[in-house]
């Protein structure tokens, strides 16, 4: 879901959302 966000933690990469080029992880 967050492929375009660049370097992010694996958990954020798979479960997070991209907002303005940054990975926003669910609470």
Curated annotation (Swiss-Prot):
Disulfide bonds join 5-18, 12-25. Its main location: secreted. It is found in: Secreted. One of its GO terms (molecular function) is potassium channel regulator activity. GO terms for cellular component: extracellular region. Expressed by the venom gland. Keywords: Disulfide bond, Ion channel impairing toxin, Potassium channel impairing toxin, Secreted, Toxin. Belongs to the short scorpion toxin superfamily. Potassium channel inhibitor family. Blocker of voltage-gated potassium channels. Inhibits voltage-gated potassium channels Kv1.2/KCNA2 (Kd=0.96 nM) and Kv1.3/KCNA3 (Kd=1.3 nM). Does not inhibit Kv1.1/KCNA1, Kv1.5/KCNA5, Kv11.1/KCNH2/ERG1, KCa1.1/KCNMA1, KCa3.1/KCNN4, NaV1.5/SCN5A, NaV1.4/SCN4A or HV1/HVCN1. Strongly inhibits the expression of the activation markers interleukin-2 receptor and CD40 ligand/CD40LG in anti-CD3-activated CD4(+) TEM lymphocytes. This is Potassium channel toxin alpha-KTx 32.1.
């Amino acid at each position: 879901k967050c492929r375009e966000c660049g370097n992010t933690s694996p958990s954020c990469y798979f479960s997070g959302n991209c907002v303005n080029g940054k990975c926003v992880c669910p609470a």
